[in-house]
Amino acid sequence: MDWNVYLSGEIHTDWREQIKEGTKKLGLPIIYTSAVTDHESSDAAGDHLGVEENNFWRDHKSSKINSIRTKTLIEKCDIAIVRFGDKFKQWNAAFDAGCCAAFGKPYITLHDEEIIHPLKEAVSYTHLTLPTILLV
């Protein structure tokens, strides 16, 4: 049986690739899915619905399109891994963790020790929390 693992969180490091490479070396049967990780593509997801003069409406349309993908992939996953980075506010990661909890999906959180306190509520339902990415 292949595991369907949803990778959520910050997009500014190669943590997803590290996990994929590590589990491939171990021969684990995993299929990975993720939100759109290219920032420009994510921001432009709703552009095919028409050009907007106001960025609010561009963001609104793109977020609606992106949310269809995110919700569907979280609902279909066996487990999620949510990485909270130390840069930028991690709204999407926190929201995805909340969706996992609401949908009854087990999830693992990854984050650095420096942000343990601000994440205490966001990770309170997690099944496992790791301070760093641990690969064999």
Where are these regions (language model features)?
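A short helix->loop->beta-strand "cap" motif at the edges of active sites that frequently abuts
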Residues: 103-107
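A short beta-strand-loop structural module common to alpha/beta enzyme folds
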Residues: 29-42
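Conserved small/polar residues in nucleotide/adenosyl-binding loops
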Residues: 126-132
